[in-house]
Amino acid sequence: MAVPARHTSKAKKNKRRTHYKLTAPSVQFDETTGDYSRSHRVSLKGYYKGRKIAKANEAK
């Protein structure tokens, strides 16, 4: 089995891990409903690009 010739220091390990980060989801303001929704997706109220596409799930 392959074994590293030298010990990986904390600094080297942490510098490598700086690239592991989360990206914030892109959200856009929907003027029809007044809510924010993800890009290219139907809003929670059933609107897409200002048009009613689907029925919204009503809370009972």
UniProtKB/Swiss-Prot annotation:
GO CC term, one of those recorded: large ribosomal subunit
**A Pfam short name:** Ribosomal_L32p
Q: What keywords is this UniProt entry annotated with?
A: Ribonucleoprotein, Ribosomal protein
> What InterPro entries does the record tag this protein with?
Ribosomal_bL32 (IPR002677), Ribosomal_bL32_bact (IPR044957), Ribosomal_zn-bd (IPR011332)
Where is this chain compositionally biased, Basic residues type?
7-20
Could you tell me one molecular function GO term of this UniProt entry? structural constituent of ribosome
Ribonucleoprotein listed as a keyword: yes
Question: Has UniProt tagged this entry with the keyword Ribonucleoprotein?
Answer: yes
Annotated region described as Disordered, given as residue ranges: 1-22
Q: Which SUPFAM superfamilies match?
A: Zn-binding ribosomal proteins
Q: Which GO terms describe its biological process?
A: translation
The UniProt entry's sequence similarity note says: Belongs to the bacterial ribosomal protein bL32 family.
Per its record, how is this protein called by name? Large ribosomal subunit protein bL32
- Organism of origin is Streptococcus pyogenes serotype M1
This protein's gene is called rpmF
